[in-house]
């Protein structure tokens, strides 16, 4: 996906178009091209990496939020369109900062504040373990779907002990920053596709 966390005044239309192309448009295009094959087979799972829609995350990230919420709307809308036809469409998002090149390169805390990427892969496995018609049309958090399938201990997903996880969605998430949940916060550096040629 494309990350661009800037104010509208700092987001040229060319950047907006790029973020929309990489996030919302790509999600739509992938679903459009895969859907006929899934419907013909009577089975499939489409999972978009996009958040539940909460407007408190929008200020300072309007272009990014529109692009990611667009992906979530694809999940909700398409799920309703194909309901009962053996194809599930859901959105999945981490509740906390995940160890990644983005979290490392842009100083989003330290390993003690992150979870491992394996929480997302396990969440995907939890989603696809359901029959498509049994779990569709939802915007899920990783820890939420894992708890639904009986995972009660999320500690093995921590990158390092001792720190407080930085919550970016769900319970105790702090709007506008990556909140630590304890009154403090880790300000996110603007993540961007800063190549001037873009």
What are these regions (language model features)?
Residues 6-8, 12-17:
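Substrate-binding pocket helix/loop in short-chain dehydrogenase/reductase
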Residues 84, 91-92, 108-198:
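C-terminal helical subdomain
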